[in-house]
Structure formats: C-alpha cells, structure tokens
Amino acid sequence: MSTEPNSPFVDDPLSAVDARILGSLVEKQATTPETYPLTLNALVLACNQKTSRDPVMNLTPGQVGQSLRQLEGRGLVRLVMGSRADRWEHTLGKGLELVAPQVALLGLLFLRGPQTLSELLTRSNRLHDFDDVEQIRHHLERLAGRGLAVHLERRAGQREERYMHLLGSQADLEAAVEAMGSDPERAAPAALSADAEARIAELETRLAALEERLARLEGGA
C-alpha cells in the first residue's frame, strides 16, 4: 500500500453498512433517476442486490435505517419528505467537496471493494462517462491526495494495480486487502459482462419500485 495522507475518517470511519448505503445511492441516482431519491424499502433492496456487489449483503430495514440516521448526522445523506413516502439521497458531493467523477468512483469502491483501473472504467459506464483509464487515475489520485482513497501496489499473481477507498475502519480495509490477496484475479461470480450486470440491476430496481407501488395500493384499499 502506497503512503497517502491520513483519511479524515480515521477517527470516525464508515461501517460496511454505511459504505453499502452510500454506494447504492450513488448508483441508483445515475442508473434509475426516475425512482431516485430512494425510499427505505427500495434502498434496502439496492443494498442487497446480488449483482454489482462484493460482498453480497442481507441487510434489514432496521440496519439500514439506523445507518441512515448516522449518515444524516454526518452530512452525507439527506431525508427528502414526501406525500406518500420519505426518501433518501446522498450528499457526498457537498459533504466531501467532490466533483461528479470522484463521487462515481467512490460509489464503485464502496460497492465492490478494491478494483483495477480497467475494472473501474468498465463498471462506471452508467455512472459517469470517463474517457479512459488515465482520466480515472487522475481522479483517484485527487481522492488519494485527500486521504479518501489509496493506491495498492500489485501483489504476487496480479496483473494490475488496484485502488480502494479509505473511509472504512482499519479492520474492514485490512479484510478487503486480505480477500484480494487470497484470490488476486477474482472476477464477478458469474463472469457477467458490465452491460449484463447493469441490465439485471436495473430490473431489480424496477421490480422494487413496482412492489412498493403495489404495497401502497393495497394499503389504500
């Protein structure tokens, strides 16, 4: 791991649940803007998606709700009051003074852990239109300069360097690096293309929206 400035989150790190929530909000803002901001139920489903998530989680509404309140207190999410349901949106750009490309990259690192430049370029195609890996490297280095990300040197058996976010606890970060080292060239579980993963994720989100709509209709019957 290269030497970088200390993370501003070192004394009050994000939990794994916090990171999953923020990453899910960043993703859905870009991929399904018609359903964003997200209701609590939609956010739980987004956090627990089987695609584009590493690791896959099984969070409860209680866990997500508790983390949302903590994130709200830190200025990283905002509650949007609605006539039918309250919704949540991230405020990473304002809260951390980030530009859109950096928000997109942090979102991916929150959702999938350490990744190579080429992986980030492929997986970011629906979040932000990066020109090439060098543009991604530029923004990652800006994040690293503020202690929000770190460059990981290639390890034995790896073909490419990786980057990871630094907003989590030391234990979580060490576990992510250890998992990467135990399977250095791991791929997506089903070896899905980025487009296929995106389509599945969008279908899951739309299904969640339909389920919410049905629940509201049944509740009003």
From Swiss-Prot:
InterPro entries linked: DUF480, WH-like_DNA-bd_sf, WH_DNA-bd_sf
Alphabetical list of Pfam families matching this protein: DUF480
Stated name of the protein: UPF0502 protein PA14_19450
Gene3D superfamilies the UniProt entry points to: Winged helix-like DNA-binding domain superfamily/Winged helix DNA-binding domain (1.10.10.10)
SUPFAM superfamilies in the record: Winged helix' DNA-binding domain (SSF46785)
Top-rank taxon, per record: Bacteria
Organism of this sequence: Pseudomonas aeruginosa (strain UCBPP-PA14)
Similarity-based family: Belongs to the UPF0502 family.
